[in-house]
Amino acid sequence: MEVITSIKEAKQIVKNWKSHHLSIGYVPTMGFLHDGHLSLVKNAKTQDKVIVSIFVNPMQFGPNEDFSSYPRDLERDIKMCQDNGVDMVFIPDMTQMYLKNFSTYVDMNIITDKLCGAKRPGHFRGVCTVLAKFFNILNPDIVYMGQKDAQQCVVVRHMVDDLNFDLKIQICPIIREEDGLAKSSRNVYLSEEERKASLAISQSIFLAEKLVREGKKNTSKIIQAMQDILEKEKLIKIDYIELVDFNTMDNIENIADNVLGAVAVFVGETRLIDNFLVQGLK
């Protein structure tokens, strides 16, 4: 496995692979890897070569968010990549990714102003800008992203279409702890009491998905059922609960096909997200 920190060197390796007609699966991460990331790597191994990038991107954090305290363990991440058959770990530093006087950004006027975008202004501009750079550097064939960041998946897919990137976005299922909590690097922030309270998040998601699959149509009643579960936990503060069209992120009044149920909450000081996606309803 190659551990690369230079953009120039990464591009050279990719160029060599492409000259031998090798396909590339790419998993973008901010590090502190967990089983959710490793499931993306497993999916990416259907390609000839697998690249994992590790970069805690300051541009997607707000001024009062957790950039400085975001969990980091590079040595552990590299070992996990090696143990799971990754071909290249790309770890550029800040000065390479954002040169002095950097002033070019990728932004859009739709999709990003809803859900997490409404609560975290500038977040998706940061995500799209850094991923556009990684796509240019690494030239992947398929990019593997987790459904837990469902809005991000839709936003990035939209960017790929708009800017004619020659790649595909593959959305992979949410990976959960045995008790249902969605895997997240931020789970490490939770105290024992907060960790217990956080189970209400997945419980609300599972209930809502069950109601949708049973044919319930009234979104306000489904949202209320989710809210009732979450509000039982005093350590949880709801950021949003939404039922939206998965492609547009527009709110829906009555359940139709392609529905995303999304939740964001604060458990103590830690912001966690979760969702369910139901497609193929008749």
From Swiss-Prot:
Swiss-Prot/TrEMBL GO biological process terms: pantothenate biosynthetic process
Gene label: panC
Listed EC numbers: 6.3.2.1
Residues reported to bind beta-alanine: 60
Pathway membership: Cofactor biosynthesis; (R)-pantothenate biosynthesis; (R)-pantothenate from (R)-pantoate and beta-alanine: step 1/1
Keywords: ATP-binding, Cytoplasm, Ligase, Nucleotide-binding, Pantothenate biosynthesis
Homology family: Belongs to the pantothenate synthetase family.
Any Pfam family the entry gives: Pantoate_ligase
Residues noted as binding (R)-pantoate in the record, renumbered to the chain: 60, 152
EC category: ligase
Catalytic residues of the enzyme: 37 (proton donor)
Note: The reaction proceeds by a bi uni uni bi ping pong mechanism.
Annotated Gene Ontology cellular component terms: cytosol
Catalytic activities: (R)-pantoate + beta-alanine + ATP = (R)-pantothenate + AMP + diphosphate + H(+)
Entry keyword Cytoplasm: yes
A GO term for molecular function: pantoate-beta-alanine ligase activity
Chain positions recorded as ATP binding sites: 30-37, 146-149, 175, 183-186
Quaternary structure note: Homodimer.
Main location: cytoplasm
UniProt function note: Catalyzes the condensation of pantoate with beta-alanine in an ATP-dependent reaction via a pantoyl-adenylate intermediate.
Subcellular location: Cytoplasm
This protein's name: Pantothenate synthetase
